[in-house]
């Protein structure tokens, strides 16, 4: 019985989303669109952080292997 209710609710929600897609039009003009947000860190900083993380994990892995 719960399965039937779930299917009915799912289909109803799906119909609402489908209706929203049908009423959408691309001819509304430009409108207000925000530009792409600037990155908060430089690419070099991100690469350095990832490298340091990998290096730390490699050191932990070596320590664990030495204990075994």
UniProtKB/Swiss-Prot annotation:
It comes from the Eukaryota. Disulfide bonds: none annotated. The modification Pyrrolidone carboxylic acid is found at residue 21. This is Adipokinetic prohormone type 1. It is found in: Secreted. The modification Glycine amide is found at residue 30. Transmembrane segments: none annotated. Belongs to the AKH/HRTH/RPCH family. Its main location: secreted. Expressed in antennal lobe (AL), corpora cardiaca (CC), corpora allata (CA) and gnathal ganglion (GNG) (at protein level). Expression in CC and CA detected in all animals, expression in GNG in some animals and in AL in few animals (at protein level). Pfam families: Adipokin_hormo (PF06377). The keyword Signal applies. Residues 34-68 form a propeptide. This hormone, released from cells in the corpora cardiaca, causes release of diglycerides from the fat body and stimulation of muscles to use these diglycerides as an energy source during energy-demanding processes. Residues 1-20 form the signal peptide. One of its GO terms (molecular function) is hormone activity. InterPro entries: Adipokinetic_hormone_CS (IPR002047), AKH/RPCH_hormone (IPR010475). It comes from Agrotis ipsilon. GO terms for cellular component: extracellular region. Keywords: Amidation, Cleavage on pair of basic residues, Hormone, Neuropeptide, Pyrrolidone carboxylic acid, Secreted, Signal. GO terms for biological process: neuropeptide signaling pathway.
């Amino acid at each position: 019985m719960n399965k039937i209710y779930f299917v009915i609710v799912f289909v109803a929600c799906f119909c609402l989303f489908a209706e929203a897609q049908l009423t959408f039009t691309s001819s509304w003009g430009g409108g207000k669109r925000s530009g792409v947000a600037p990155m908060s860190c430089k690419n070099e900083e991100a690469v350095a952080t990832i490298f340091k993380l990998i290096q730390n994990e490699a050191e932990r892995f070596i320590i664990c292997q030495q204990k075994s």
